[in-house]
């Protein structure tokens, strides 16, 4: 097997075309081996195998610099840069290799930690400028998918690359897909370029000042080598537009490109997944999308908004079709999603934008400026917030509470159960005074038989679930059940702790906190996120001039990567027994 012996791209240069074709097939098999056992991005990587072999054959990494956008197509690159063991070995070997471009893993061949989209051209222009200032001559190659071109930073990067005017090569990997189908006017031009074999006179890239090459056969190794050789060492900004097939070489991924963008482990022979990995349990994605579709039938102003990730809202292709004009996806463009939601709310619609926690930071300014300053009553549905969701350094979901709670004019709600979530969602949609964000629970779908409130205040109003004394536990959102566990363990120690569901993350309920002073010595706060700048620190600040002691439970601010959840909780003293130990040390 060639790839077991390849330690660097230089080894490829000793091979003829037929051997390179074997390398490509071995690389595809290795990628399939990894994703079938470990999970990961399937379709994007399979479609970029031949292009990766050709790039490394033609160019001279690490002297020539590759910048992968979003990293969804970087697995073949890893196989060919000395990391094949992470694709051929056992699961432990695979765990040692990140699913994203990572200089921490390979400082020689991976130039940036990348996991969010539309950044490659901008990053590459920085390398371009550094090269020009230093007077060196390496090739700078940015690799970006057509889906990533819907993001505003991609436009900014292309604009700057053209302005710099020196050699940079931008490989547009056009597989006619984002995670789902593409949305945006640019895709009409990409389609026209594909249909005309690159000859369409209305060429978006040429209008921006780029030299332009088109290759229809984007999975043909020989033609890829030829087109890359034709632009090597260029002194002009150049786009190489290649038409690839997402999922190439694996029929299930070809037949259902959206479902196979990313996947849990599967049977590589037929693409089937076990019942466990298929996740037959209830999910908020499914519950939310079904609820929205029912509500849409009675309210034509209700709009489901997504930004390139309709699965985050449970809007499958069939559900998107059913929703029709009442679902809008604007591609991977969170800034546009937020600002457009604000505009829709201003115009009398009821938009609900669903966004992964990790992508909130991509649109902080629009939330603050375009939404909150204008007090437009759009709803932000924040999903997968917390430590138990995504664990790659580029996708940490721990910072949405500090970010959103720092913005004046935004109410951030944290439901603890399914029933409470939908009550909050209905109120947030109906009210017309303020933007409301809701942190969807990330600890599974928990039901309650207790009556939940249907009306909420614009001022923070905590809910005392059990009134005790000495110790008060204020447990927010997904950590409410942890609060229940801690209260139960404390009761075994003879401590009848008060248990509070705060519901509001953005501001303290001064009335409730004042009431606690009479019969409590310690307040424990629990939140599933970064405690630095978070919910608990606001409560600690409130009590800072009093005798009340506050134990803030959350996760220390850091850039964690591929962490084990239980270990992370243990390291931050967030296991139930650890919290009880810390409480007892303080009060006894």
Regions found by a protein language model. Name each.
Residues 70-75, 144-151, 172-178, 218-219, ...:
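Acidic, glycine-rich active-site loops and adjacent beta-strand->loop/helix elements
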């Amino acid at each position: 097997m060639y790839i077991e012996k390849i330690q660097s791209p230089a080894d490829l240069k000793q091979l003829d075309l037929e051997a390179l074709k074997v390398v490509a097939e071995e690389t595809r098999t290795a990628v399939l081996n990894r994703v079938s056992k470990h999970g990961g991005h399937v379709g994007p990587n399979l479609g970029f195998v031949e292009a990766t072999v050709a790039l490394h054959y033609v160019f001279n990494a690490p002297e020539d610099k590759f910048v992968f956008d979003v990293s969804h197509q970087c697995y073949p690159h890893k196989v060919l840069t000395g990391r094949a063991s992470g694709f051929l070995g056992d699961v432990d070997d695979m765990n040692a290799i990140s699913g994203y471009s990572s200089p921490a893993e390979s400082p020689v061949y991976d130039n940036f930690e990348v996991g969010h989209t539309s950044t490659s051209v901008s990053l590459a222009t920085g390398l371009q400028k550094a090269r020009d200032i230093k007077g060196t001559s390496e090739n700078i190659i940015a690799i970006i998918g057509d889906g990533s071109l819907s993001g505003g930073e991609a436009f900014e990067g292309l604009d700057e690359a053209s302005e710099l005017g020196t050699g940079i090569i931008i490989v547009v990997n056009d597989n006619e897909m984002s995670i789902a189908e593409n949305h945006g006017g640019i895709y009409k031009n990409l389609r026209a370029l594909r249909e005309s074999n690159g000859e369409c006179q209305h060429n978006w890239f040429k209008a921006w000042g780029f030299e332009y090459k088109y290759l229809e056969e984007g999975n043909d190794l020989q033609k890829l080598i030829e087109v890359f050789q034709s632009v090597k060492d260029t002194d002009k900004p150049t786009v190489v537009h290649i038409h690839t097939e997402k999922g190439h070489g694996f029929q299930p991924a070809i037949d259902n490109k959206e479902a196979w963008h990313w996947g849990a482990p599967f049977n590589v022979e037929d693409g089937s997944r076990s019942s466990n990995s298929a996740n037959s349990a209830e999910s908020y994605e499914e519950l939310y999308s079904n609820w929205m579709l029912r509500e849409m039938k009675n309210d034509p102003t209700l709009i489901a908004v997504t930004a390139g990730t309709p699965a985050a809202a449970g809007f499958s292709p069939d559900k998107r079709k059913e929703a029709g004009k009442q679902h809008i996806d604007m591609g991977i463009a969170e800034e546009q999603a937020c600002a457009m939601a604000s505009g829709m709310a201003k115009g009398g619609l009821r938009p609900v934008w669903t966004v992964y926690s990790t992508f909130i930071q991509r649109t902080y300014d629009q939330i603050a400026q375009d939404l909150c300053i204008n007090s437009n009553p759009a709803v932000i549905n924040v999903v997968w917030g917390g430590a138990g969701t995504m664990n790659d350094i580029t996708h940490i979901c721990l910072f949405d509470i500090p970010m959103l709670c720092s913005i004046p004019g935004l109410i951030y709600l944290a439901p603890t159960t399914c029933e409470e979530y939908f009550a909050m969602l209905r109120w947030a949609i109906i009210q017309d005074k303020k933007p409301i964000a809701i942190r969807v629970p990330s600890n599974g779908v928990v039901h309650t038989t207790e009556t939940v409130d249907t009306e909420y205040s614009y001022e923070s109003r905590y809910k005392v679930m059990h009134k005790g004394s000495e110790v008060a536990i204020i447990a927010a959102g997904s950590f409410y059940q942890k609060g229940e566990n801690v209260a139960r363990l404390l009761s075994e120690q003879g401590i009848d702790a008060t248990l509070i569901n705060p519901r509001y993350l953005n501001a303290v309920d001064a009335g409730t906190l004042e009431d606690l002073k009479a019969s409590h010595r310690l307040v424990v706060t629990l939140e599933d996120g970064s405690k630095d700048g978070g919910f608990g620190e606001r409560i600690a600040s409130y009590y800072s001039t009093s005798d009340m002691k506050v134990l803030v439970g959350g996760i220390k601010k850091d850039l964690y990567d591929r962490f084990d959840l239980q270990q992370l909780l243990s390291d931050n003293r967030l296991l139930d027994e650890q919290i009880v130990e810390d409480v007892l040390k303080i009060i006894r």
